[in-house]
Amino acid sequence: MWKLKIAEGQNGPYLYSTNNYVGRQTWEFDPNGGTIEERAKIEEARQQFWNNRYKVKPSSDLLWRIQFLGEKNFKQKIPAVKVEEGEEISHEVATIALHRAVNFFSALQATDGHWPAENAGPLFFLPPLVMCMYITGHLNTVFPAEHRKEILRYIYCHQNEDGGWGLHIEGHSTMFCTALSYICMRILGEGPDGGVNNACARARKWILDHGSVTAIPSWGKTWLSILGVFEWIGTNPMPPEFWILPSFLPVHPAKMWCYCRMVYMPMSYLYGKRFVGPITPLILQLREELYDRPYDEINWKKVRHVCAKEDLYYPHPLVQDLMWDSLYICTEPLLTRWPFNKLRNKALEVTMKHIHYEDENSRYITIGCVEKVLCMLACWVEDPNGDYFKKHLARIPDYLWVAEDGMKMQSFGSQEWDTGFAIQALLASEMNDEIADTLRKGHDFIKQSQVTNNPSGDFKGMYRHISKGSWTFSDQDHGWQVSDCTAEALKCCLLLSTMPRELVGQAMEPGRLYDSVNVVLSLQSKNGGLAAWEPAGASEYLELLNPTEFFADIVIEHEYVECTASSIQALVLFKKLYPGHRTKEINIFIDNAVKYLEDVQMPDGSWYGNWGVCFTYGSWFALGGLVAAGKSYNNSAAVRKGVEFLLRTQRSDGGWGESYRSCPDKVYRELETNDSNLVQTAWALMGLIHSGQADRDPKPLHRAAKLLINSQMEDGDFPQQEITGVFMKNCMLHYAAYRNIYPLWGLAEYRKNVLLPLENN
């Protein structure tokens, strides 16, 4: 039986932590673990997922939940309640439903105070890791038999009916992820016609029917070249000389978005080396299986710009293709020959210096899973027996996650992000005495997860921003500051500081709060919006150089509605509790941030959500930020338009249901199913409550709350539905904790702000 381990790790030469591994999540397989009942539940969960895999694509994340609830002997003692047709919701019924949700969710808290959860969904995360382990000869040690079994389960569970795999678990089939998944199955031991339901044969047919892997996007061309089933001359150049350009140039790496920078850093190293893994019998077989013509007859130069239409979200502009062609025809031939190859060697040396710096400052977690595998492979190419690679191996378990649909690779974990919202949801329930231990542990986790130092050495010279006082998306070891993660954690610390110490623990020291405020203030742009990781400000025209085909807006850092709104709320609360600290700066910050939210509102009254689906998510954040800054339905046209949008999109069952297609299409798309999405319903409900809807017409709120109450399960859980997270416009991300956090929070705000005033009258 698989078991989730929390905050475990032994300090040694290859594994170390800045805060004793608080927040770390790792899975271990115990062949003798679990009771007969627990094993039966897990098998039932696996079978149910398989049977419904085309209806509900995200997992319900049940394995660790079964484990935790069993360890705590949790039993829901409060009977379920339902609101009948035509019946009004009483304060008592809302309290019972909320109490049940709070009881259940509190039981899911880990020993270190955070809430574990899957944070995955993209189907290009895991295969490169498997490929990397195959190339380096560590496949069987990193992925023993039970790991391989669960990886294959995941691949089978998310194969589309047409035989392919999407960019993410809810997406249409793409060449990129179909080819990667096929290769992954073959590496893990499946034959050309093997796999459950003829998985390999169906996948290969899809690939060949759609033009073969010559039509794979650029990232796929890179990985296949590394593996040896594609040729580097069929890829666009990624010159490592980029890292030794003068800093005044507009295309300097310091001006790039951190994730773009961190992907192309190791990619350019591997490209500069023209590294190719061992050509094994399997690689030779793949060369035959993945193409519609003999491998040695392919004109590689002609396939550089070829991309399957199923993968193409961002068509490259002509200026970009001209740039690649210039580098390919003119620059690369020079840089690979004497004496210019000396410049190439210098560039490779500098690039590797940056890779090591980033690895060390993230404790070898790196900024994310795509970057992790590339940096790890680059370290192996530099020195297969070196300590750098061994340190990378020690952090692979941090990325692996097991659920009823198998083993997948996480983005890098959402521990801090989820916990920040979880604490706010629980505080809104006003059941503080009953859940004091839960709040105290959550408070401790947040305090222990704050980043306490800037990156090491001359961090600005390594293109890094301040991080002292920030919070990351995951844990302290990760090290990368994020504005909204910082703002949400800061809100928690401020709210908890107003409560009795004996109830929730020692308040965070003011100096550490000041450090957090400093980070948030530093990330505001001239237009008033907040960037996420680093200050924005590079020229927008650089997006014309976006080298990917399936993402948008990845070259430079941008401002985001959610980051801006979270930061407004945090600083308004901070100003109230610490009125003497940087007051003038904070006032200016809030005014400019409000103007940004007003400026980016869509014509239909909504706001585009960059990290959740989509206009519902963005509108909840924006309304919360505007109201916190003193805007209201009466004095703000933006608030009125936002409210009208939410009311207009409410469905007949009282909920909201927005399709993930809204994100790439940038237009509101309703779910095609009749059932509303409970997470989105909670977002919209809270957005309307922020705006004072209860005073105008509470009926839409009652209808939404009724849906949440009636959808609650027997144990106090809520059902898993459609995926609700997103990044880079076109790729969805499964936040498994959202189905608990937001319905609970929505009911808490409803009970506190809608029902209580009515009862007091």
From Swiss-Prot:
PFTB repeats lie at residues 148-189, 513-558, 590-630, 639-680, 701-742. SUPFAM superfamilies: Terpenoid cyclases/Protein prenyltransferases. It catalyses: (S)-2,3-epoxysqualene = beta-amyrin. One of its GO terms (molecular function) is beta-amyrin synthase activity. Keywords: Isomerase, Repeat. The active site is at D484. GO terms for biological process: triterpenoid biosynthetic process. PROSITE patterns: TERPENE_SYNTHASES. Expressed in the leaves and in the epidermal cells but not in the inner tissues of the fruit. GO terms for cellular component: lipid droplet. InterPro entries: SQ_cyclase_C, SQ_cyclase_N, Squalene_cyclase, Terpene_synthase_CS, Terpenoid_cyclase/PrenylTrfase. Its EC number is 5.4.99.39. Belongs to the terpene cyclase/mutase family. Oxidosqualene cyclase converting oxidosqualene into beta-amyrin, generating five rings and eight asymmetric centers in a single transformation. This is Beta-amyrin synthase. It comes from Solanum lycopersicum (Tomato). The gene is TTS1.
